[in-house]
Amino acid sequence: MKMKRTASSNSEAQSYNESPHSPLRFHSPLSDAGDLPESRYVSPEGSPFKIENPKSIVAGNKLTQFSPLPSPIPPPPPQFPPPRRQRNARVPMNSSSDKSPSSMVVHNSWVREDGGQTTTRKAGAPINGEESTRTTVNRARGDDLVSLTALGFRITEVILCVISFSIMAADKTQGWSGDSYDRYKEYRYCLAVNVIAFVYSAFEACDAACYIAKESYMINCGFHDLFVFSMDQLLAYLLMSASSCAATRVDDWVSNWGKDEFTQMATASIAVSFLAFGAFAVSALISSYRLFTHASS
């Protein structure tokens, strides 16, 4: 009876071990039947991975239950404090989670920088406008001052030329030793140049007054500044030449015959003619300034 019970217990144990529902057979590497389809811990056929503890898988959904990959290993906790050699080490930016925040931060910084630059340009625009307005006002004041100076020198030229040719035209003596300016070509040359300079300076004085009053010349043409500059240069050289010739004639007369009333009047006329030359030289500088300033603008 005892033998039968032992045999039956052995057969039951063997049948229990060979049973497909037995957990021993489920974990046995010698099992040929594989896992039961009804089991929760079913692994797919031909899976290259062996799951040692299937219960560790969280049953979130069917895809997670039947995943052939093992569960990810959680990262180790950080060390506090870090080792001395790692305190100054740079953290590598390899993870995808680190890339997106850094790119977003850089993008935002670019947008902010652009906005600041745009604001700076807009704020600087009125300053440039004020500077240009101030420059225009200063230029207008400078033009007015130049116009008044030019008018003053034109009036001076008119007065000096009138005095010079008037004295030369009146240089005549009576008597047996009488003499006249028209007998000497140097004096006639000086008289003619002073008359021409007087006519031109009178016309330019009227033109300058018209420009100050109406801001327009009497004769508006494209080459007005060039004409004025050329005439000022020409008459200045002519006055210098005529005055020098007349002064040479007076010096020759005084060295041979001495001083008298005739030579004294000629000397006075020549001196005023030199002063007129100085006024025309200043007018030539003013006209050259106007010419090159208007040409550059």
Curated annotation (Swiss-Prot):
Domain of life: Eukaryota
Annotated region described as Disordered, given as residue ranges: 1-135
Membrane topology of the entry: Multi-pass membrane protein
Subcellular location(s) per record: Cell membrane
Topology, Cytoplasmic side: 1-149, 213-225, 287-297
Skewed-composition ranges (Polar residues): 1-20
UniProt KW keywords: Cell membrane, Membrane, Transmembrane, Transmembrane helix
Single GO cellular component term: plasma membrane
Annotated Pro residues bias: 69-83
Transmembrane feature ranges: 150-170, 192-212, 226-246, 266-286
Main localization (coarse): membrane
Topological domain spans for side Extracellular: 171-191, 247-265
Record's keyword annotation contains Glycoprotein: no
InterPro entries: CASP_dom (IPR006702)
Sequence similarity: Belongs to the Casparian strip membrane proteins (CASP) family.
PANTHER family in the cross-refs: CASP-LIKE PROTEIN 4A2 (PTHR33573:SF61), CASP-LIKE PROTEIN 4A4 (PTHR33573)
Record note on quaternary structure: Homodimer and heterodimers.
Listed name of the protein: CASP-like protein 4A2
